[in-house]
Amino acid sequence: MNKDTDNVEVNIVYKNRTISVPINITMSICALTALLKSYSITGSYHGYNHNYEYHHYHGYNHYNGYNYGKNNKGKIRVGVVSDHKPPFVLTKFPNEMLLLNFRIKEGDRFYVIFEDDYGIPNTHAHDIHESYKQYEPYEPYKSQKNIYIKTLKRAIIADNHRMVEYILDKELVDLHSNKKLYEKCIKLSKIHSRTYIQNLLEVVAL
């Protein structure tokens, strides 16, 4: 039986429209993507471990999971969160393939981001670990954060299949000045530590 506190209304900005979607924080990524599909927040669904379609332009141009029409605008991307890596190093696989291929261990954090298109290079499933290495050695994190964070509309943080709303709309970024909203994030994110949330806030502020 679901508790009332497990149900969250999330406003998703997608293709210049705002869609209010009721999300339960205990749902799996598969259930979440199916729910989003029912709101037409998808393109073509390609399945889990197949449909690698090679393009000469930038390598693998069709992502396993979702392909959002021309130029892949308005993607939903999934990434693994680590305290030692920037939270915007993203993969392109918003479904269980994330769990199957990348073997996320129990307790690992991951999240789903709804955003406009930006230029993170295409990543083949087998190259996922290389994609993390690609960003770790780089010193100018600030410039990268500025590039990536400015197009971010809304993030949902998850931990071991638990979906948790995290307010990152541009008008609500400064959670430090809104104690009530900040406490709501803490409450919704009971599976995370205050330090972890604080770190995310600092990343957003950069």
From Swiss-Prot:
Record membrane topology: Single-pass membrane protein
Major localization listed first in the record, in broad terms: membrane
Lineage: Viruses, Varidnaviria, Bamfordvirae, Nucleocytoviricota, Megaviricetes
Protein name, entry field: Uncharacterized protein R660
Organism per entry: Acanthamoeba polyphaga mimivirus (APMV)
Residue intervals passing through the bilayer: 21-43
GO cellular component terms attached to this protein's record: membrane
Compartment(s) where it occurs, according to its Swiss-Prot or TrEMBL record: Membrane
Keywords annotated in UniProt: Membrane, Transmembrane, Transmembrane helix
